[in-house]
């Protein structure tokens, strides 16, 4: 399915989806994060073109857009709306004393807090043709307090799936 990753970050989730064959549009609104991801894609493309055709095929399925995701989704024509919208909003700040991973600490400094994540879920539901998938910490409350149709749970994260009927 065609996936819109509305919270691209460093693109790791989008890369996994693209490696599974999904065309993915990644939307990132923070200019510094967008620049990091764009540079990473450029470097991967340059390296892959000389050595790895599989990597090139994956990268061809990935498109990067610098925009506010809600505004981007609202401007899509019906024929260009994705089957799936994927959201990975900044996880809530930890209550544990242990620090987050180094890359996430940098993200928290750049992004602070995703204060509009609840609204983004609503916009995503209006945009997605089939479903919205939200990645959350396993013990975090549901985004916007909205219970999903079903949940896929791992050791530390879960994926809340909201179906559009």
Functional labels for PLM-detected ranges:
Residues 1-9:
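Conserved class I S-adenosyl-L-methionine
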Residues 89-120:
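Mobile active-site "lid"/loop adjacent to the S-adenosyl-L-methionine
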Residues 117-163:
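Conserved Class I SAM-dependent methyltransferase catalytic core
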